[in-house]
Amino acid sequence: MFVEHLELVDFRSYVRADVPMAAGATTFIGSNGQGKTNLVEAVEYLSTLSSHRVSNDTPLVRLGADQAVVRGRVRAGTDDARSLLLEVEINARRANRARINRAPLTRPRDILGVLRTVVFSPNDLAVVRGDPSDRRAFLDGLVVTRWPRMAAVKSDYERVLKQRNALLKSLSGKGRSAGAEIGATMDIWDNELATIGAELLSARLDTLSAVMPLTSAAYREIAPVNDLTTASYKSTIDLEGLWSPPQERESSTPIDRKELANRFLDTLAKRRADELIRGVTLVGPQRDDIILHIGEMPAKGYASHGESWSLALALRLGSFQLLRDDGIEPVLVLDDVFAELDATRRDRLASSVVQADQVLVTAAVASDVPEILRGERFDVGGGQVLAYEGNNDD
């Protein structure tokens, strides 16, 4: 799968841009602030309806415009000429819209799963060093990329959680005296939260089990050490007997989702008094964390900058390989990656991804990108994307 043409209208800094692409490597070269990342961000948005740079869509619409349009022609594969035209209209004042082959979709999220991407950028350092929310976002993003229907599950969970929190807040401070007011209403929300939450948690655990052995292999390939990278899942729900941390890639027994939902419900019941006092839900995936290790030590707080960077990159490369193992050929985006790597790690990274259907690279300096990934190159600057003329070789 690869993007063979990208068109932007009023997206970020671009009034308009038309960019032909090809399978293999494409590199966008330009100084910082010239718009090269905007191009790969647009490809990411077509794939995920989100950006790795911002939490809402407002900055994606060019200042002074009412809407932005991202349009991409996606080809099925290097040996498959079938293609689809994907289009997303990002509106500043009303709901976004999406189309496939000019036909409008009922909901924008129906476009998810047509184009798959794996994006690595300097922001990914937060997955290793940042807050639990950064690691949850990474894992949930991979879950939705694997199974696009999980976007609706996640949305449903967030809706129920919001409504349950509103109920708890209205009863906050009443403690045990609120029991008569809660009655069946709280039980209904608990059941719905546990059922949907168990589905989301099960998908997270399955994905973590699958991606970590691949991440460990990628880390050893990139870093000049042979440390094993592992992960454990810190849950508010007792997972003993249901799931154990992944060590090696081997077939695992599917998680008993019914038992997981029952444990979720039991934990909610035990924490209800505390929740009534605090006015917020204290149990569920929104409270969980993924603990990453390099060797015997937790990466957060102990790993060096170089180790953290290598682990963050390995997580994305593991994600890329997992999707390929699932039968999906994603577009790989390496946004300002090579400037942070020494020559040895650059070459190792390039060698590990060169066989991808499509690799989109951004760089301030052309010489940072290994020769085997040069491929098609563009100069980016002044709101234009032009054929490369060698102005940023040093």
Curated annotation (Swiss-Prot):
Pfam families associated with the record: SMC_N
UniProt subcellular location: Cytoplasm
Keywords assigned: ATP-binding, Cytoplasm, DNA damage, DNA repair, DNA replication, DNA-binding, Nucleotide-binding, SOS response
MF terms in GO: ATP binding; single-stranded DNA binding
Protein family: Belongs to the RecF family.
Biological function: The RecF protein is involved in DNA metabolism; it is required for DNA replication and normal SOS inducibility. RecF binds preferentially to single-stranded, linear DNA. It also seems to bind ATP.
InterPro entries attached to this UniProt entry: DNA-binding_RecF (IPR001238), DNA-binding_RecF_CS (IPR018078), P-loop_NTPase (IPR027417), RecF/RecN/SMC_N (IPR003395), RecF_2 (IPR042174)
Keyword Cell membrane: no
Entry binding sites for ATP: 30-37
Protein name in the entry: DNA replication and repair protein RecF
Cellular compartments per GO CC: cytoplasm
